């Protein structure tokens, strides 16, 4: 063998990863790489780059879970090569999926299914779940209008301040979005303004059970009752879809007396994120329909796939089964008792933060993390007319220097002059961690007080997460 080749081969085998030739070059970013490299070197390059990401546990902007126990990691690893859509090849994974649908339907008080299987599906997240719920609303409305001999070219959807997925739905499926705007003193959809926006072309009303801007619940029952009166007055029957991305896995455990789900007859479908307060890893959502009549069969496809026949009503197709299996693990592991304990712990942290932050500045609280008002979030603004010598953007920027990602942002609609700060409390953000946040909060306030000339420059660099 050529001596140079032998030397190169020996080096490739024996060099440490930090002595390897490949690690002394800049990782390719614009062209497909020409040559291979050792697996440990490729891993080291990527692993090192990921250190530049923020610390997920300190991300108090996200609604998504940032802590999973080791058994979830094991189950995800076991399922990484199982395709969720291949029901025939992975029948037990498919059975677990159906069990989860039944469990979620039971949690949300869906009527007992005629054939023993609840109507619903797992999704990649609550956004896909919203899309599916919206599609079913449009199809049901169109069928009613066609039966009455009326035009179907101008559908509209009525909602309050919603997550961007509903704007996408409206654009993709050619539906007019009648979003009731936020305004000072009225940050949610109220019955009066909702009714003013409704007509016979309204495919449905979508309350958000856990508004992303503030964390408060947009309570469905008053809206539902107003729609009952609207039907009595006009004869127009309007369905509801509940976007319970966050609240769907909270209220059943910590505020069961809130009537928001299928106990309301107009509620035909509900969507939620498994990977938010459902405690599943990222990539899990759920949508449940009241019954088979609520899901138009035109949306259900029976397709041949790798030798099998499956019925599917999802937008995404191939994806790993691990998220569903991990969700089932959480359901089995915790049950109602365990979920109640975990969610109550998050609310206790939120209440503690709200009480302590109230002592530190001239703040007006929009959400204090109480189970009867919303999700475990703390949202506040500076009191009108008060000038503490800093903005919430300044405070957000200072906290970020310590690794805390706490968003400051303006509200939407007619309330864009209101700047708020929002802190999300989730599993894994325990009381001791909250105390560390408060220490850094106080240190940030002291710095801003000592350096007034540096204030006011943070707004352009601040981030939001709504």
From Swiss-Prot:
CDD domains: DOPA_deC_like. SUPFAM superfamilies: PLP-dependent transferases (SSF53383). It catalyses: L-glutamate + H(+) = 4-aminobutanoate + CO2. GO terms for molecular function: glutamate decarboxylase activity; pyridoxal phosphate binding. It comes from the Bacteria. Its cofactor is pyridoxal 5'-phosphate. The keyword Lyase applies. Induction: By acidic conditions. Expression is regulated by a complex system involving RpoS, cAMP, CRP, EvgAS, H-NS, GadE, GadW and GadX. The level of involvement for each regulator varies depending upon the growth phase and the medium. GO terms for biological process: glutamate catabolic process. Pfam families: Pyridoxal_deC. Substrate binds at residues 62, 83. Its EC number is 4.1.1.15. Pyridoxal 5'-phosphate binds at residues 126-127, 212, 275. GO terms for cellular component: cytosol. The modification N6-(pyridoxal phosphate)lysine is found at residue 276. Keywords: Decarboxylase, Lyase, Pyridoxal phosphate. InterPro entries: Glutamate_decarboxylase, PyrdxlP-dep_de-COase, PyrdxlP-dep_Trfase, PyrdxlP-dep_Trfase_major, Pyridoxal-P_BS. Belongs to the group II decarboxylase family. Converts glutamate to gamma-aminobutyrate (GABA), consuming one intracellular proton in the reaction. The gad system helps to maintain a near-neutral intracellular pH when cells are exposed to extremely acidic conditions. The ability to survive transit through the acidic conditions of the stomach is essential for successful colonization of the mammalian host by commensal and pathogenic bacteria. Homohexamer. This is Glutamate decarboxylase alpha. It comes from Escherichia coli O157:H7. The lineage of its organism: Bacteria, Pseudomonadati, Pseudomonadota, Gammaproteobacteria, Enterobacterales.
